[in-house]
Amino acid sequence: MSKVFKRDFFNYGGMFYFYFFIWAITFAFLPIWLKDNAHLNEVQSGLIFSGISLAALCYHPFFGYIQDKLGYKKNLFAIIAGAMIFFGVFFNWIFIPLLEYNFWLGLFVCSFYMSLCLYGGVGVVESYIERVSRSNGFEYGHVRLFGSIAGATASFVGGILFLQNPESIFWAASISGAILCVLLYLAPVKKDVIEKTKTNNAVITKNDVFKILKLKDFWFFALIIVGTAAIYDVFDQQFPNYYVTFFDTKANGIDTFSKLCAAQTAIEAILMIFAPALVNKIGAKKGLLLFGVLTFIRIAGSAIFTSITMLSIFRLIA
């Protein structure tokens, strides 16, 4: 393994780590925080998450087009990383006052801010690092492993922080955002790679973007995403509040849930080592079908069984 390979691999792995640390520590405990600290009911919390997803739909077409134009340039990634520094400020000092002033205003601002950083921004982060990994000759799936490790760490640490002070998880996210910015700055892309990209890449026009919308396969793929990933996200958003109701105290429920999430992402990290080989063997289409089946089993099992043990087992799936 060359010196450059080591530096790039761990640099971009570190970027994945701190990005998904923010993702995990936020979304694992946000449903509980919205209920207990922001004093929102289940319907209002659902609207918050729906707003974030809707904002992502607005961001994605533009982010994809802009990132294709930028190629290896880090401008858009830098905007997303910079915005993540303000998680602590936003949730502790801005979001709740906005909700108290006007719920819909708070919903609107939160949706576009959170989606910029996470639901909308994740595509930029993953596609950029995937592109860099190919140009530097290392396996993207192995770099993505750092994200799974971050999930396990964030879930465990987040549970401890949340029980001591719920607001502290957002300050932890801000610190991670600052480290992410430093790692992004320290990960320069070679000029020859940028020039090669300019030479080899075909010019992407607006007509090319609109032609995609006319493809039948594109809409079938979108339907698969809506039927699996979107439902998966809704399930994950509502599960924490549901899970803790089976415990004698909410503190015990939160503590167990954080450890369960840590165990899940640790298992995910191990599986990520073998995931690239599996997907290469069975193909992307069968990989998506497998994901859909596992998602169905996870959600259906959680709806049928009501014991803590069975709920924990189904939470570990997918």
Residue ranges of predicted features:
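Helix-loop junctions at membrane interfaces in 12-TM secondary transporters
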Residues: 7-9, 91-110, 303-315
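Loop-to-transmembrane helix entry
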Residues: 40-51, 138-143, 171, 246-266, ...
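Helix-to-loop junctions at the C-terminal end of transmembrane segments
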Residues: 58-72, 161-162, 270-284
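Cytoplasmic helix-loop-helix junction between adjacent transmembrane helices
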Residues: 112-147
